[in-house]
C-alpha cells in the first residue's frame, strides 16, 4: 500500500496544484511524475545509500526528491521555476537533508554548489526526471566539468535515451552516443509510459543509467577537437565518411587525395558511413590526422 503522503500520486499532485494555483509551463517541459513504482525503480537503479549525495535537476513538486531524501545522505536540487520554490519548501519540510537552489542548471556554478553541500558524501549521483527540451546540454555540461560525479540515473525522452545507449551500426548511433559513451558506461533501466505523468508528455520516456568510467574509453589529447571530428562524420548520415570529411575540412574538395590517404593510414575504408565507426576508430582517425596539417577546419 502506498504511503498516502507520497507526492507521486494523482490525488496528492492534483491537491498541490489546486492549493498553489499552479499552471504548467510548456516552455519548461514540466511533466510531473505521479507513479511511486516508477520512482522506486529509479531509486533502486541508483544504488543510493546513507553516504550518497544526489544532484537532482527539475524537482518539480518534489515527488522524486522526497524519496531521494529518504535514502540519500544529502540532496541538492536545482529548480529553474521560481513558482515551485514555495511548493518545495512545503512538500520537503520534513527533510533537513535537502537543499533547493532556484537556478538554471546550465548557468549555475554546480562545482561550487557540490563543494558547499555535498562535500561530506562518499559518492555523488545525478538522479533526475530531466527537462526533455534540454536533456543533452544538461548531461554534456555535467560530464565535461570537473565535478566528482560517479554516475547518472536519469529519465528522458525515449529517442534521446536510445541514442545515448546505442550500439555501433544501429540507427540511433551518432555523435551523442560517442560523447556519452566516452565518459560513461551506459545501460537502459526501464521504458516509462506517458500515463505516469501529469500532464502526459507527447513522447515516450526512458530511464537510463550512465556510470562514470575511471578512465575514458580512449585516450585523446583534446576532447573537444576529438568530438568535433567524430560529429563531422554524421553531418549527413547517408553520405560516406569520405564525403562528409570533404565537406568538413577547409578546402576539403581540393584535398580529396589527402583525405583518402588519411583514412587509409587510419585503416578506415572511405566508403563506410559514420554510424559504422566505433569510438576506437574515431580515435585512430584523430591521431592519424596530426600527420596531415593540410586538413584544417
UniProtKB/Swiss-Prot annotation:
InterPro entries: KsgA/Erm (IPR001737), rRNA_Ade_diMease-like_C (IPR023165), rRNA_Ade_Mease_Trfase_CS (IPR020596), rRNA_Ade_methylase_Trfase_N (IPR020598), rRNA_adenine_dimethylase (IPR011530), SAM-dependent_MTases_sf (IPR029063). One of its GO terms (cellular component) is cytosol. Its EC number is 2.1.1.182. It is an enzyme of class 2 (transferase). Keywords: Cytoplasm, Methyltransferase, RNA-binding, rRNA processing, S-adenosyl-L-methionine, Transferase. It is found in: Cytoplasm. One of its GO terms (biological process) is rRNA methylation. Its main location: cytoplasm. This is Ribosomal RNA small subunit methyltransferase A. It comes from Staphylococcus aureus (strain NCTC 8325 / PS 47).
Amino acid at each position: 500500500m502506498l504511503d498516502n503522503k507520497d507526492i507521486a500520486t494523482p490525488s496528492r499532485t492534483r491537491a498541490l496544484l489546486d492549493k498553489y494555483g499552479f499552471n504548467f509551463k510548456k516552455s519548461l517541459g514540466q511533466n510531473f511524475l505521479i507513479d511511486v513504482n516508477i520512482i522506486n525503480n529509479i531509486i533502486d537503479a541508483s544504488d543510493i545509500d546513507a553516504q550518497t549525495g544526489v544532484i537532482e535537476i527539475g524537482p518539480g513538486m518534489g515527488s522524486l526528491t522526497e524519496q531521494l531524501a529518504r535514502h540519500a545522505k544529502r540532496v541538492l536540487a536545482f529548480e529553474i521555476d521560481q513558482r515551485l520554490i514555495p511548493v518545495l519548501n512545503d512538500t520537503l519540510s520534513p527533510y533537513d537533508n535537502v537543499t533547493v537552489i532556484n537556478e538554471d542548471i546550465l548557468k549555475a556554478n554546480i562545482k561550487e554548489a557540490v563543494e558547499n553541500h555535498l562535500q561530506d558524501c562518499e559518492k555523488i549521483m545525478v538522479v533526475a526526471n530531466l527537462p526533455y527540451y534540454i536533456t543533452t546540454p544538461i548531461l554534456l555540461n555535467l560530464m565535461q566539468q570537473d565535478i566528482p560525479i560517479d554516475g547518472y540515473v536519469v529519465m528522458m525522452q525515449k529517442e534521446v535515451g536510445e541514442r545515448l545507449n546505442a550500439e555501433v551500426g544501429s540507427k540511433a548511433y551518432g555523435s551523442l552516443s560517442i560523447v556519452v559513451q566516452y565518459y560513461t558506461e551506459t545501460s537502459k533501466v526501464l521504458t516509462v509510459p506517458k500515463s505516469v505523468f501529469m500532464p502526459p508528455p507527447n513522447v515516450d520516456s526512458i530511464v537510463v543509467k550512465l556510470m562514470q568510467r575511471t578512465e575514458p574509453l580512449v585516450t585523446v589529447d583534446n576532447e573537444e577537437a576529438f568530438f568535433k571530428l567524430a560529429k563531422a562524420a554524421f553531418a549527413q548520415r547517408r553520405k560516406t565518411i569520405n564525403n562528409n570529411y570533404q565537406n568538413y575540412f577547409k578546402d576539403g574538395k581540393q584535398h580529396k587525395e589527402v583525405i583518402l590517404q588519411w583514412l587509409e593510414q587510419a585503416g578506415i575504408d572511405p566508403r563506410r558511413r559514420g554510424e559504422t565507426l566505433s569510438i576506437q576508430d574515431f580515435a585512430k582517425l584523430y591521431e592519424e590526422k596530426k600527420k596531415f596539417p593540410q586538413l584544417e577546419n
